[in-house]
Regions:
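Weak global preference for isoleucine
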Residues: 5, 16, 39, 58, ...
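A structural "domain/chain start" motif
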Residues: 1-63, 161-163
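Solvent-exposed, acidic/flexible segments
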Residues: 51-59, 101-103, 134-143, 147
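Surface-exposed short loop/turn segments
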Residues: 64, 78-120, 125-127, 132
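Generic marker of "main functional regions" within proteins
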Residues: 52, 76, 93-94, 129, ...
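Short acidic low-complexity segments
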Residues: 69-80
Length: 163
């Protein structure tokens, strides 16, 4: 890094200024930047009607979104910078004709591991899903929650986490 002496003169083209500027010793500094990607430990507990789901839809999508934004993942919490914890459960709602309604509530928390401090939390509360049976309506509710996460919450999450 060094000072640009020519920029200090502005629009002046004075030959005297040029002569003086050449005789000045400009301080210089070398700066070494270590660019490091945030390392994430991700845990999840996704359920439908109290039963553990075979696939973790929200956490898988969150992992994909974070990876696309430059985050790396680890299986060891102690080596992580951030801990993302996803908890979600779908509950049975009503039946209207042949349409089954399910409500999904999901909580996503982010903690700084080394400080042991929660830095972000959001809730996707009672996201409504529809289907021809409760299982299909649960999948629909999870899909709508993922859409909400992507479109409404992801930018906020990234802004807070990357500060």
């Amino acid at each position: 890094v060094s000072v640009n002496i020519d920029a200090l003169s502005g629009t002046s083209n004075s030959p005297i200024y040029t002569l003086v500027a050449r005789t000045l010793t400009v301080p210089r500094a070398q700066v070494v930047l270590k660019v490091q990607r945030p390392i994430v430990f991700l845990t999840s507990e996704e359920r439908s009607f109290g039963q553990t789901k075979s696939n973790d839809q929200i956490s898988n999508r969150l992992r994909n979104l974070l990876a696309n934004n430059g985050f790396e993942f680890t299986e060891s919490k102690s080596s992580a910078d951030l801990w993302f914890d996803v908890k979600a459960d779908a509950e049975k709602g009503s039946i209207s004709g042949s349409i089954f309604i399910t409500y999904l509530t999901s909580v996503i928390k982010v903690a700084a591991v080394k400080e042991g401090k929660e830095i972000y939390a959001t809730t996707l509360d009672r996201v409504k899903g529809y289907g021809l049976d409760y299982d299909k309506s649960s999948v629909d509710a999870y899909n709508k929650a993922i859409e909400t996460l992507e479109k409404e919450r992801m930018n906020e999450l990234l802004n807070i986490v990357l500060q």
